[in-house]
UniProtKB/Swiss-Prot annotation:
This is 1-(5-phosphoribosyl)-5-[(5-phosphoribosylamino)methylideneamino] imidazole-4-carboxamide isomerase. It comes from Xanthomonas campestris pv. campestris (strain B100). The lineage of its organism: Bacteria, Pseudomonadati, Pseudomonadota, Gammaproteobacteria, Lysobacterales. It catalyses: 1-(5-phospho-beta-D-ribosyl)-5-[(5-phospho-beta-D-ribosylamino)methylideneamino]imidazole-4-carboxamide = 5-[(5-phospho-1-deoxy-D-ribulos-1-ylimino)methylamino]-1-(5-phospho-beta-D-ribosyl)imidazole-4-carboxamide. One of its GO terms (biological process) is L-histidine biosynthetic process. It is found in: Cytoplasm. The active site is at D10, D132. Coiled coil: none annotated.
Length: 244
């Protein structure tokens, strides 16, 4: 299995931002130079990037179609993107705009039957399921929903198994406790997922801070790692990460 580094940009109100543990009230802004940053990813040798529409994640209705098209055409990057994907029409529109893969998050937890139907319709390589998880006191990986204020009935293990059996290829999993914290990814979580469903191509997300974290994700047999804050704040050089 090849290993992919996904430099990431989260967009809100046209600006590159990062949220601390997904909290919209704890936002750091990094400027509105989205296209130049994407070009810099390509110039460093990246083949993929991860693009998130934070406005849509909150309100629904993906808003980055025009920007996505620009990035795809001008940089040659393959873009994995999502935020507010709630209908079949959303998926089709984002793919038509130039996405290589569409990320489905909240709906994948709320209505797995519908999303499994999309896998069959659009192809298992065109969707990435994103699951945000938090470990409870009993050690069970739960799936917080509705802005992480409630917990879904299904657990991470149950949904990951269900999607794997339905033919899902790409699973992006974020440990909420590590998101934006630069405290290192929770490699125990990813080892657990790899053992649970070895056929899944698991992407590491949340907490990556240095080359050792990238190397650990690769050594664990994960398919890739999403790098956000560490790149934006200069803790990690993209060329070095790509060469890892």
């Amino acid at each position: 299995m090849s290993f992919t580094v996904y430099p990431a940009l989260d967009i809100r109100d046209g600006r590159v931002v990062r949220l601390l543990q997904g909290d919209y009230a704890r936002e750091t802004r990094y400027g509105d130079d989205v296209l130049p940053r994407a070009q810099a990813f390509a110039d460093a040798g990246a083949q993929w990037m991860h693009l998130v529409d934070l406005d849509a994640a909150k309100a629904g209705g993906y808003t980055l179609a025009a920007l996505l098209g620009q990035i795809s055409r001008q940089t040659g990057l393959q873009v994995q993107t999502g935020g507010g994907v709630r209908s079949r029409e959303d998926v089709a529109r984002i793919l038509d705009a130039g996405a290589a893969r569409v990320v489905v998050g909240s709906l994948a937890v709320r209505d797995s039957a519908t999303v499994i139907g999309w896998l069959q319709e659009f192809g298992t390589d065109r969707l990435t399921i994103a699951l945000d998880t938090r470990q409870d006191a009993a050690g069970v990986w739960q799936l917080p929903v509705h802005g992480w204020t409630e917990t879904a009935e299904a657990t991470l293990d149950q949904l990951a198994t269900q999607y794997a059996q339905a033919g899902l290829q790409h699973l992006l999993c974020t440990d909420i406790a590590r998101d934006g914290m630069l405290s290192g990814p929770n490699m125990g979580l990813y080892a657990h997922l790899r053992a649970l469903a070895p056929q899944l191509q698991v992407q590491v997300s949340g907490g990556a801070r240095n080359l050792a974290d990238v190397a650990a994700a690769k050594a664990a047999g994960c398919a890739g790692i999403v790098l956000g804050k560490a790149l934006l704040e200069g803790h990690l050089d993209l060329k070095d990460a790509l060469a890892c």
